[in-house]
Amino acid sequence: RVLEISFDDGQRFEYTCEYLRVYSPSAEVAGHGPGQEVLQLGKEDVSITAIDPVGNYAVRLVFDDNHDSGLYSFEYLYDLGVKQTAKWQDYLDRLAAAGHKRRTH
């Protein structure tokens, strides 16, 4: 369950569905400002069921847990790719701080 995106500058990133889901830019996940993020739990097995283009600047990802309100701009996706290692570690750290163990297969 990986989405691969190639950008015009030659950069190519692979994103797990879980990573994209827990970093959804929707207000229900990202909040309405810094510090208002909502920690997403139990998304280890989430999959993308549809990718809908939004103009020439974004895609709407539809996940099998019925989350579909995030518009992922290509700029945001690029940033998620560049910062993937640090952002993933931050997510794991926040899970641990919340006392949640991520399921591994």
Residue ranges and their predicted role:
Residues 1-105:
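Motif-centric detector for short Cys/His coordination patterns
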